[in-house]
Amino acid sequence: MKKFISLMLSAVILAGASACSANQSTNSEASQSSADTTAASTAGQATEAKKDYSEEQKQLENSLKQMNFSGVVRITENGETICEVALGKKDSSTGEEIKPGTQFCVGSVSKQFTAASIMLLQEEGRLSVDDKLEKYFPGYKYGKDLTVKNLLSMRSGIAEFYDADYIDNVYTELPAGELSKTVTNGATVEQNQKALESWLLEQPLTFKPDSTFTYSNSNYFLLARIVEIVSGKKYNAFVRESFFEPLGMKSSTFIDDVDWKNLPNLAKPTVDAKTVYVGITMGLGDIISNADDMDVWLTSLRTNKLISAKSVDAMIADYSPEDDLVYGYGLIPDGMGGAFHYGYFTTYHAMAYIHPEKKLNLFAVTNDDAHAEGDFTQLCHYVIQHILDK
């Protein structure tokens, strides 16, 4: 990832500015110079406020059409939509088209909500990222060695519980090994979550805590459990009450709270995923949303509406400087002041991006597995780079 960011940085054109000064012979000349400077500054501000992104819009739309893209991409600057594309079919059986407000599963983009939940609880004095896990999971063998921060930054060594495999031409994530005997399609949400937690807390660590980075969904499932333990609420209820409702995110929900495949406004997966286990995506890949709601959410992060600037800064910091891979808390810093995360769930792929200083948000999502992360997401990074260079 750092190699990718380095390549991105090499594409940035740095412009220098020179200044000159001149002696003023009279007060009136000084006054005129000041007026000219003010006028030029005002004109410059007006020009900056009216940046033209029509080329970026055209490039984005044409490229996505060439990909036969099915989904939505929206880029906003300071609350104004500057690029937006909605293409493809919401439901191939009916021919209904995707619209900007269509809902999608966002996969691991959900992790930033879990991280934000932890940061909110820390701000309220109800936990600390430096807390040892033994505080929340008494009797856990490695509870004295691991912290909440290790989970957030993917530096815990806790084993990944997913086995990735292709089943019926769908990339499906299955419970690993012995876990598949207790986490099943026939179980309830609570039964699967209890079985998963027990399994995770019995596994040996895959590396010494905080010695390296390894992406593991298990970290964020356990973080969601910590949110439940500390708040006394179900994780979904906590996120809904803390974020969805205050922000008016009425098109956002959780796959375990609804009959998600039959949501009327959901872009249907292009291939039916036959093995989606209830409960086990909690905190790591369980949110359904749309471009409207996600832009509101990303703006709230940028503007510190619900959590502080200190917390957001912690989320977009790099906790693995010794590694080629970069990770913060539920977000991946891009090395240029922004941060993003990808998401994957059955045939859905998503990307969310913020740049606090430039006041930029991007949300991109597809319901078609043909458009993997190396496809439309690279295009999104490219367009964002063009916008940042303006």
Task: Please annotate each region the language model reported.
Residues 3-98, 122-127, 153, 157-158, ...:
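N-terminal leader/targeting segments and the immediately adjacent pre-domain N-terminus
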Residues 20-24, 44-86, 275-390:
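Catalytic loop of the DD-peptidase/beta-lactamase superfamily, centered on the K-T-G motif
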Residues 56, 106, 110, 114, ...:
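Hydrophobic (often cysteine-bearing) scaffold residues that line and stabilize catalytic clefts
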Residues 67-71, 94-150, 207-216, 282-285, ...:
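Short active-site loop at a secondary-structure junction
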Residues 81, 133, 139-140, 255-262:
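Short, solvent-exposed turn/loop segments enriched in Gly/Ser/Thr/Pro and often Arg
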Residues 146-346, 350-351:
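Short, surface-exposed loop or secondary-structure junction motifs
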